[in-house]
Amino acid sequence: MKVDRRNFLSGALAAVAALGARGSNCSPASGGGRRTWGERLAEKGMLFIAHRGCQSLAPENTIPSFVCAARLGLQAIETDVRFSKDGKLICSHDESLKRMFGLKKKVSDLDYSELRTLVPTKGNGLTSWPKELLRIPTFGEYLDVCEKYDAVPFIETKGDKAVVKPVLDEVRRRGLSRVAVLSSVSFDHVLEARRCDKEIFIHHIFSKPEQLDELAAQGNAGLSYNYKDLSTVPEGLVASVHAKGVKMCLRAGDTPETVAKMIEMGLDYIPTNVTVPCV
């Protein structure tokens, strides 16, 4: 479907502004009526994950990137969560602020009141959005977007393992344990997530074959392996993962050809950095 860029951005801008005016959701939301991650997989057969939001139209891990992904119908929105200096849960892939903000500081060096004054210097759509809308969002603000649009929160925890429990506490407070996904490159984070929450779907990023049995034993789990070229994926690998009751994805579905190959391989969900190639 062809999307009119100007009209789409106008609608998304209004939606972002409305979220900002409302403020962060302060009362527990009812997640009981929402479809679980497993139900969505069963219904669709394949789910697409907007990696760090819709990076085609807004800088990564910003409220506009999350809203654009949701309004384009992406079933899940991925973000990265870590602590600020004062212990706030914020959305930022990098610990360093150099790449996205041109600042030679770490996220953990600054309180959130300082972080929220920063404006990205890198990314698409820098001039499409008021600067105040591009500030580093809190984890709660990200969840507000996911709840508003009934998108799956696909949450990657970063940094110290201590971040996992407060992330899951907030997910549980909103009634989203059976809807959200907790992912991490760190296997310790994934195991901690299962210890803290028996319901949430856990996903191990760039897993190793020797970790498959332990991951399968956790139940309700998925993984990705680090294959940059799909032609090098061993024959039968997807089937062997599925045989253990574990879901699987590979990175990243950024071209129609790659997506078609991933579907042919029988993968369960596809992260994408190019969510709107038609815009």
List each language-model region with its residue ranges:
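Glycine-rich, proline-tolerant flexible connector loops at the mouths of alpha/beta enzymes
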Residues: 83-94
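Metal-dependent phosphodiesterase/phospholipase catalytic core, i.e.
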Residues: 36-39, 93-199, 225-228, 242-244
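Structural preference for beta-strand elements that scaffold enzyme active sites
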Residues: 47-49, 76, 152-154, 179-181, ...
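N-terminal secretory signal peptides and thylakoid transit peptides that target proteins
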Residues: 1-16
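A cross-domain feature marking catalytic cores of carbohydrate-active enzymes
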Residues: 52, 79-81, 155-159, 184, ...
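C-terminal active-site rim and adjoining tail of enzyme catalytic domains
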Residues: 11, 126-136, 203-279
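Catalytic domains of carbohydrate-active enzymes, especially glycoside hydrolases
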Residues: 68-81, 221-223
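C-terminal segment of N-terminal export signals and the immediately downstream linker at the start
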Residues: 22-49, 57, 70-72
